[in-house]
């Protein structure tokens, strides 16, 4: 049996046990104001600390969890743990990814609201990140669920913006609060003028529609300066920080200007 098959079998056998026995953990990637002065939010990202195989990245188990029907319990664990840990971080948003399978589950909205209530988390601080895949199967049902979620004060972000076929239609129809420009555009921005033009256009469109604009995958000072000049509101990427444990977010929030040294050295 090759390594990929061994990994898949191990994930199938062990992931349910990991969810039930606290072998998962969350790291949080900071989302920073465009001038780099303020931590405005964090994105919760799951990690798996396997007792025999060490740290397993999400790229090795999320897709398998979707295939094997484990993505709903996994996603519910992530949301509950994130709300529990982030409850102490006042004044910043908590972003949590929602998979298409999770979103289409009949109890999705009820589970989100129950989790918020049971963890005593402020719904105004929660932001659910949706991709185009969440919306394409049943747009009417998706719209109803989104309206219900927003009625409870929870924010919605369109993730991976610019990579799908119908993103502009979704911006017109669905009530998003934020768009996240996909990292793939930033990867080629410095080598191709077309990517820079597209990023500029997406930022302008978001602002014109009254949406917050966040650029993902920011890794260089040149990207930062460009994104600031075109009017992005928020930035996320390795220039500022990789995903870190909750204790590091605690530390960053105690600082007046947590990313000043990073930007000065860039």
Question: Where in the sequence are the language-model features?
Answer:
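Short, contiguous acidic/charged loop-to-helix segments that flank catalytic cores in large enzymes
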Residues: 65, 69, 136, 188-194
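Short, solvent-exposed loop/turn segments at secondary-structure boundaries
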Residues: 6, 107, 140, 190-194
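Cyclic nucleotide signaling catalytic output domains
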Residues: 1-10, 14, 60, 64, ...
């Amino acid at each position: 049996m090759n390594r990929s098959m061994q990994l898949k079998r191990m994930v199938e056998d062990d992931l349910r046990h990991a969810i039930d026995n606290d072998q998962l953990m969350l790291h949080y990637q900071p989302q920073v104001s465009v001038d780099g002065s303020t931590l405005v939010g964090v994105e919760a990202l799951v990690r798996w600390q396997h007792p025999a195989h060490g740290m397993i990245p999400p790229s090795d188990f999320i897709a398998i969890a979707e295939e094997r029907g484990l993505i709903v319990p996994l996603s519910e664990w992530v949301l509950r743990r994130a709300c529990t840990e982030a409850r102490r971080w006042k004044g910043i948003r908590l972003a949590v990814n929602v998979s298409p399978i999770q979103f289409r589950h009949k109890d999705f909205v009820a589970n989100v609201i129950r989790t918020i209530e049971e963890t005593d988390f402020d719904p105004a601080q929660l932001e659910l990140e949706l991709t185009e895949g969440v919306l394409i199967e049943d747009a009417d049902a998706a719209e109803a669920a989104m309206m219900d979620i927003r009625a409870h004060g929870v924010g919605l972000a369109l993730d991976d913006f610019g990579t799908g076929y119908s993103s502009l239609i979704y911006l017109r129809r669905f009530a998003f609060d934020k768009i996240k420009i996909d990292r793939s555009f930033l990867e080629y921005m410095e080598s191709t003028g077309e990517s820079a033009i597209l990023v500029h256009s997406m930022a302008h469109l978001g602002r014109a529609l009254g949406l917050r604009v966040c650029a993902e995958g920011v890794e260089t000072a040149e990207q930062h300066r460009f994104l600031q000049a075109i009017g992005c509101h928020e930035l996320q990427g390795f220039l500022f920080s990789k995903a870190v444990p909750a204790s590091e977010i605690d530390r960053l929030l105690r600082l007046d200007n947590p990313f000043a040294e990073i930007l000065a050295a860039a």
